[in-house]
Amino acid sequence: LIKMIKYAKEKGIVDVHFHSHGGLLTEKKSEELLDSGLDKLLISIDTPNKEKYEKLRVLSKFDNVISNLKKFKELRDSRGSLGPLIKCNFIEFPGITKEELKANLEFGLTLADCVGFQEYIDPTCTIGENKKFQPGYKSSFICQQPFTRLAITEDGNVSPCCLDHEYELSVGNIKENSLSEIWKSSGMENMRKKQKDGKFYEIDRCKNCEMATNGDEGIPTQFEKYGPTL
């Protein structure tokens, strides 16, 4: 991981970040990450409730994760470094009160520079009132993925989408073509055109994507809150 981060920064990648549960963020690993040039560290906390957290994140220990994250932030700040930016992600569970939401935010900002919230709503609960599920509905959704990123497997296969875990949308392999060639390939251009033309549903992997059915009108909604130092 450290080698990959350093390599990406050496090659001029502007924004290098990764998601983690934080359980393996030891002091040694923290030092290595701080030296690597990493731009952002994103940690999924989901809830500040220990019991609920350990039910959601099986095998993860809440106290260990929180301790690791606090130590990472302290180590970064002791160096006088502005980066990497630390972000904690939480889930807004059904029935959460404004007071609980505020408490989650305050808790998150003791651990990180910014906090992201994602509201959990089961789309099937809103079929009667959500026009996305009505006959003839045409979504205005345009996915940003093929315009902004590439996902690469350990085998070198390339997909235009980080949610394409089975790599059904493979557009090439870096062992056979350069990233520039793949980025400008007909496969990528076709993906972009279908997105711009509002025809993402013609792509098998995309037609049932949660981003398409949930993302363009706020189900789930997401917002971020930054701490006072940023």
Task: List the model feature ranges, each with a label.
Residues 144-146:
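Short, small/polar residue-rich loop motifs at catalytic or cofactor-binding pockets
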Residues 134-139, 194-197:
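Short, P/G- and charge-enriched loop/turn segments at secondary-structure junctions
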Residues 1-110, 114, 118:
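Radical SAM/AdoMet-radical enzyme domain recognition
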Residues 157-158, 163-230:
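Flexible mid-to-C-terminal extensions adjoining Fe-S/redox cofactors in radical SAM and related proteins
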Residues 149:
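Short hydrophobic/aromatic beta-strand element in the GNAT-like acyltransferase core
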Residues 152-153:
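Short, acidic, Ser/Thr-enriched surface-loop or helix-capping motifs
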Residues 92-96, 116-132, 165-168:
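Flexible glycine/acidic-rich beta-alpha junction loops that bind and position SAM and/or redox cofactors
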Residues 139-142, 205:
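The −1 position to Zn-ligating cysteines in a subset of zinc-ribbon hairpins
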